[in-house]
């Protein structure tokens, strides 16, 4: 029996470190010899750069980027375009056969807007694993951007951590969050080896975990509860 697939969520900061990105793809190539791998990625820094270049500004609320519908063409271009194809190119350089996707492809995830004040910011839930099963069955590496759409066809910006969680739930996969930090830090700046629900609530309440890390740990907790297995956060 084949082991469960592994979903690796890659932060946008990795795209600014070509050496680290190449090393990661080399390791993914090795990992594919033993199990299926699926990559889900963000691209926050790239979005910021493209928006700044076009004179656009945005704010974040609880780690989520407020996204007017008018900004979606730029965000789609950054995530589903530049970031996705850059990762696919790096995968090819490592001898991997990638397939660039978004959350709407194959109806893999169902997405809906979270709240009107956040604009085109959505949340994803598992829907159909058919496309991903076909791809990993043929040894392709799905590289999935965090762009989704609602049932009525509205493009949505999905937080990449939450998107990766939904993909892991869909595939019954293990989940690994990679970012530019070593892991979750305590109030003394020391990395926590483990983190349970009670510890997380305490660190959030005391303001140790905030913003983007709160979104990441919330997604990891949800995934751990749904998958009934640990979720890993690291660099």
Predicted segments, located by residue:
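Nucleotide/pyrophosphate-binding catalytic subdomain
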Residues: 1-232
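Conserved glycine-rich acetyl-CoA-binding loop
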Residues: 235
């Amino acid at each position: 029996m084949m082991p469960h697939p592994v979903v690796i969520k890659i932060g946008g900061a990795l795209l600014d470190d070509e050496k680290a990105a190449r090393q990661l793809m080399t390791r993914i190539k090795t990992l594919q010899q033993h199990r299926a791998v699926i990559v889900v990625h963000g691209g926050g820094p790239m979005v910021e750069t493209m928006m700044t270049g076009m004179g656009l500004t945005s704010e974040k609320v609880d780690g989520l980027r407020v996204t007017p519908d008018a900004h979606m063409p730029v965000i789609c271009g950054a995530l589903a375009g530049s970031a996705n194809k850059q990762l696919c190119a790096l995968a090819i350089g490592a001898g991997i056969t990638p397939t660039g996707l978004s959350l709407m492809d194959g109806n893999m995830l169902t997405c809906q807007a979270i709240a009107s004040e956040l604009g085109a910011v959505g949340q994803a839930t598992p829907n159909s694993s058919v496309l991903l099963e076909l791809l990993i069955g043929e040894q392709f590496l799905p590289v999935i951007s965090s762009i989704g759409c609602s049932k009525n066809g509205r493009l949505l910006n999905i937080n990449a951590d939450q998107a990766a969680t939904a993909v892991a739930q869909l595939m019954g996969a293990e989940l690994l969050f990679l970012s530019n930090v070593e892991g979750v830090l305590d109030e003394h700046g020391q990395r926590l080896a483990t983190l349970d629900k009670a510890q997380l609530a305490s660190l959030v309440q005391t303001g140790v975990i905030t913003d983007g890390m709160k979104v990441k740990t919330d997604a990891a907790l949800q995934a751990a509860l749904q998958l009934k297995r640990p979720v890993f956060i690291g660099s």
